[in-house]
């Protein structure tokens, strides 16, 4: 190998900050592999314009950048106050009234956007407002009114979120707005579609059906942010198996299950998703201080590094790039931390699933290739010649310090593999098949500077290049 590649990928959120001063190009140049469009904000026209710009810049820079559309999900929030904000003291009585109109809130009461809240709570439940900064204990429920007492005081302003400690709010995962946004996602041609607040696998299956009906074949991302989704191993598996990608959305999830539980859940989700051949994104407040500061805190550095050590495919930036003062600097800082963490030898130790039966020939080839790569002295890279990107995903589920090159003629496949840990997408097309095509691919990587003469590489491919799911061959070649 002639160059060192970052294995952990970076997801960046688009917003006003990336719209100005050529920041979008700077962010992609700094190392963004996936861009996230938050459908909570902006019009369909805004999203289409940003997507077009991303593709234009990616082509200009010779990069493959995936586009992730993030559905808003149910709005479980307080309504608005007359003065815009109140301060609640410990011991205050406070009413949540589903019948109260917007702008009528005060120090004693406020409306709620989610009209099903009174049916979801009972006396003794703890409600967490504004990510837990204000906490209320339910005293009584009368019709559409929830009477509470303040147990943790503080300021409360318009439209702050409501969570229930331990989960249990029954709001549907997909709203009418989400269904409209799925059509926008289809129009844009997003590579990934994130579903907010799924309660179970069926929520994700429903989203997938709606997406297909709209003409959107994006991979489905499960944003794990409800306590119900992680309350047991079966619940966790149900969500993971129904998705293509898992996002550890630590904000709402941490509020519902409590911060002490979050550490173990993050590690369990990442570990289990990799076992089940799913990709993983770790998100929320990873470099929050860089919204206003040019350097991350040491705690943020450790947080990103620990996610890398856990085995995450990608780490995500939200407000840091969408609305921060230093969007490209934040991406560059995160890239440096990832590279630093990837130097630690333990994360490259093979964890082969030798006790697990493989589901298909493709998986058997991917696992055997990685076993050979990790045990044959002198191997410098793995090359997957892929139509769908599936083999690249499965090879990347096995820990290794070796780069994996996903080589495909399909732009969408290359964009999808931009998310996968350790995978570098490279455009490749050939009229040849078999060993001739494999040699051609190896020579292309050598000419691009990824390989050097004398390198030993492992290639996976099918008998015919243009057939999806046909991977059935592993070759070991020496670069000429």
From Swiss-Prot:
Residues given in the record as ATP binding sites: 38-41, 77, 160
Keywords, sorted A to Z: Acetylation, Allosteric enzyme, ATP-binding, Glycolysis, Kinase, Magnesium, Metal-binding, Nucleotide-binding, Potassium, Pyruvate, Transferase
InterPro entries to which the protein is assigned, alphabetical: Pyr_Knase (IPR001697), Pyrv/PenolPyrv_kinase-like_dom (IPR015813), Pyrv_kinase-like_dom_sf (IPR040442), Pyrv_Knase-like_insert_dom_sf (IPR011037), Pyrv_Knase_AS (IPR018209), Pyrv_Knase_brl (IPR015793), Pyrv_Knase_C (IPR015795), Pyrv_Knase_C_sf (IPR036918)
Pathway: Carbohydrate degradation; glycolysis; pyruvate from D-glyceraldehyde 3-phosphate: step 5/5
EC number: 2.7.1.40
GO cellular component: cytoplasm; cytosol; pyruvate kinase complex
Alphabetized GO MF terms: AMP binding; ATP binding; identical protein binding; kinase activity; magnesium ion binding; potassium ion binding; pyruvate kinase activity
Protein name: Pyruvate kinase II
Organism encoding this protein: Escherichia coli (strain K12)
